[in-house]
Amino acid sequence: MRIDPKASASAWLLSGLLALGAAAPVGAQAAEPELPAEQVEQIVRDLLLREPELVLQALEQLQRRQAAEQARRQQESIAANQAALVSDPASPVGGNPEGDVTLVEFFDYRCAYCRRVVSSMQALMQEDRQLRIVFKELPVLGEDSVRAARAALAAERQGRYTPFHFALMTSEDLSPDAIRQLAAELGLDPDQLEQDMNAPEIQEAIDANYRLAQELGIEGTPAFVVGDELIPGAVDKGRLEALIADARAG
């Protein structure tokens, strides 16, 4: 059946209703080469008056199809970008670098939801000695976020990424002076850190993360990738442990 594009809002509902086995009068229209918008809308109205519960069924069916299609596309994208996810030399690695499962985290230092999972990430690193964690700086919340991401990647050059990362995650102040002070407290050279923050490779690494996030359909932080699963949002430790166990099992 071809339907006038002007009827698109009603058309997808009609197609869902038809898929659920809606009444015969609709089938009588299917032989026509094209249905105008007014006719489609009238068919939908008639169906709604006769069997309103079909609307919910059609919507649920559409949502299931959309969710399945989104999951399929994400898995394909994860497979296509596997090297960028787990093997990018510009992305710092925590936990066991030789671990048997890799957990990738996309985050922003100003993101309240990212801060919620800090304790879970620290606990996972301590408890699971075979877990490898890849940190993907994804500063999306303004200038302070970008500055903190640059500083963290610069700290990697001094071999202090992980402690500096977690310190930034719990710091309320991400100003230049606060970052310098934090670096000094953790035994980094603040002057060297500041110099390295402006290295072009640092911005290139962040830009690569932006592109990768877009490829994967990541729309916010935090987001996690384990195996072929992408999990958005501040998931709890138990959920992460289950995903890691699934990846390890199979």
What residue ranges belong to the model's regions?
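N-terminal secretory signal peptides that target proteins for export/translocation
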Residues: 1-6, 103
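N-terminal targeting signals for export/organelle localization
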Residues: 2-3, 12-15, 21, 25-83
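Intrinsically disordered, low-complexity proline-rich regions
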Residues: 10, 16, 81, 106, ...
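C-terminal cap of thioredoxin/glutaredoxin-like
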Residues: 31-45, 182-250
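Solvent-exposed, acidic/flexible segments
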Residues: 33, 37, 41, 48, ...
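A short beta-strand-turn-helix
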Residues: 83-101, 125-126
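A generic local structural motif
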Residues: 88-92, 119-120, 210-211
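Structural alpha/beta surface segment adjacent to cysteine/selenocysteine redox centers
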Residues: 104, 109, 115-189, 194, ...
